[in-house]
Amino acid sequence: MDTSLISIIIIAIALAMDAFSVSLTKGFTQKNLTKSQILYYGLFFGFFQFIMPVIGYICGTTISSFVSTVAPWIAFFLLLAIGLNMIRESLDSDDEYIMDTFSFKELTLLAVATSIDAFAVGITFALLNMSLLLPCTIIGIVAFIFSISGIFIGKKLGNYFGDKFEILGGAVLILIGIKILLGY
């Protein structure tokens, strides 16, 4: 196997880890996800992990310094808000039905927030004058697989540990946001 292909696969796995963590969280907090909703998670995370390097590549160096300073803050605040909301919902027993709801809005926000690193990788691809098709395809496929795997593993953990696992899920999202913020 070509060393550049190995490098792309390693990058894809690294980029997919945030999507995996979020999917794991969703798996153990949203126990009633249907197969089609699980597929949506994989498709959304895979699509945004695929498209963000393309957008980063297009932006290239023209606005990279501005974007690289603002993007982590956007991801942090999105994940912080969603994480705090999950914790609040888990502590409010009257709102238990909200925990199991599926939301395209939340899914989109999570997919965007976890793909900020992929955007930065796209800027790097532009600086290295790399082609995009193969790396972006691999990144998207790996994110898709990791997201779906995360949900299934999370569902198993959620069944084992119970409903209050949502507090941990919210904390995980907040920690991912902090990691993104500190990584820049």
Curated annotation (Swiss-Prot):
Family matches, as InterPro entries: Mntp/YtaF, Put_MntP
Membrane topology, as annotated: Multi-pass membrane protein
Sample GO molecular function, one term: manganese ion transmembrane transporter activity
Membrane-spanning intervals of the chain: 5-25, 38-58, 67-87, 107-127, 133-153, 164-184
Keyword terms, alphabetized: Cell membrane, Ion transport, Manganese, Membrane, Transmembrane, Transmembrane helix, Transport
Compartment(s) where it occurs, according to its Swiss-Prot or TrEMBL record: Cell membrane
One GO cellular component term: plasma membrane
Function description: Probably functions as a manganese efflux pump.
Family classification: Belongs to the MntP (TC 9.B.29) family.
Protein name as it appears in the record: Putative manganese efflux pump MntP
Organism expressing this protein natively: Methanobrevibacter smithii (strain ATCC 35061 / DSM 861 / OCM 144 / PS)
